[in-house]
């Protein structure tokens, strides 16, 4: 749990290091944003916010949780683990026009490749594959693990319905939960 929390915090801090300075430089444009939350990383103090608990669609930010849980399960064993692509990994995305790496049913993919594809190409089929890996069987099992992690972290305004972030009514988070 500590490794997952540390990895998740590192990813969020890196995202914040890129996004927050740009937002600060933008000045008044931030006031036109639907929701934002700027938190002191050392103290947890909310420095500025607007609608910080409003439940919004997280899109591909969802993959931060997906990647975090996959990394936690792997515990550094990146190269030896092979994942087998299932029918669900590929065909659950049919008709979504989502980003993918064209995985083929039955294909064996090294864990490290699935991690890179999900992180760098925002591959939704890669996110599905990772969810099956850390969930222990199906994408639904992976999503259940994601929501268990949400509960453990005390994220009151977050719920996942998939591992990739494709829009769904029951898939939401708040900027405070993400901070």
Label each PLM-derived region with a short phrase.
Residues 179:
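Acidic, His- and aromatic-enriched active-site or binding-groove loops in soluble protein domains
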Residues 4-24:
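Sec-dependent N-terminal signal peptides of Gram-positive bacterial secreted proteins and lipoproteins
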Residues 25-176:
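Active-site-adjacent loops and short helices of periplasmic peptidoglycan-processing enzymes
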């Amino acid at each position: 749990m500590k490794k997952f929390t540390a990895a998740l915090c590192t990813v969020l801090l890196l995202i914040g290091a890129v996004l927050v300075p740009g937002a600060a430089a933008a000045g008044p444009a931030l006031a036109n944003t639907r929701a934002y939350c700027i938190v002191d990383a050392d103290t947890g103090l909310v420095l500025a916010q607007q609608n910080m608990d409003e439940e919004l669609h997280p899109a591909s930010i969802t993959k931060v949780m997906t990647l975090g849980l996959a990394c936690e399960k792997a515990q550094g064993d990146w190269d030896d683990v092979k994942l087998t692509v299932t029918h669900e990994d590929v065909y659950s995305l049919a008709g979504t026009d989502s980003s993918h790496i064209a995985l083929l049913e039955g294909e064996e993919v090294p864990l490290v490749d699935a991690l890179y594809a999900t992180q760098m190409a925002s591959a939704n089929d890669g996110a599905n594959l990772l969810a099956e890996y850390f969930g222990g069987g199906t994408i639904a099992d992976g999503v259940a693990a994601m929501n268990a992690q949400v509960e453990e972290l005390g994220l009151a305004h977050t719920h996942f319905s998939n591992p990739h972030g494709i829009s769904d009514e029951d898939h939401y988070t708040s900027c405070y939960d993400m901070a």
